[in-house]
């Protein structure tokens, strides 16, 4: 029973993507990178002074606004992210990193850019292609994608050291 209070603390952290730990890290100078899919290697997002946050939209009610911009046939997760972004729920992000794995998520990330839902001057959205198979060719292509679309963008935009 003594551990229950600790579990409640961590459970409460999941209620908001911009939780206490993220706010503290950002106050300490960290660059907050949002991502939406497990295909993005977290280890690449947590380099130098960057931290990664998997985007969620807990406590989302109506999806009416995002449904206006996206079809109601697209997945609720993609529309919930757009809804939360339009509401200003992702203003804390410094960048959004995604993959071209599903068209609904591509569409939602496109709306982050088109609707300019983040007012930070250096905010950017970037996509990477996913490998179709695990072969040397695709591993090389995926490595290039991560370097060009994620690591190099972080270095160019924020001066992040990705030399390791």
Question: What is each model feature region?
Answer:
Residues 1-164:
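An N-terminal assembly and electron-transfer interface module characteristic of large anaerobic redox
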């Amino acid at each position: 029973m003594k551990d229950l209070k600790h579990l409640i603390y961590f459970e409460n952290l999941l209620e908001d993507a911009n939780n206490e730990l993220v706010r503290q890290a950002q106050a300490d100078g960290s660059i907050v990178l949002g991502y939406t899919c497990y295909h993005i290697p977290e280890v690449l997002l947590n380099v130098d002074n960057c931290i990664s946050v998997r985007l969620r939209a807990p406590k989302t009610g109506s999806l009416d606004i995002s449904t206006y911009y996206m079809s109601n046939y697209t997945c609720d997760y993609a529309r919930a992210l757009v809804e939360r972004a339009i509401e200003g729920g992702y203003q804390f992000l410094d960048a959004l990193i995604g993959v071209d794995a599903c068209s609904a998520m591509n569409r939602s990330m496109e709306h982050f850019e088109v609707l300019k839902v983040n007012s930070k001057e250096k905010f950017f959205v970037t996509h990477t292609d996913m490998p179709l198979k695990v072969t040397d060719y695709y591993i090389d292509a995926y490595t290039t994608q991560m370097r060009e679309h994620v690591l190099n963008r972080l270095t160019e935009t924020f001066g992040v050291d990705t030399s390791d």
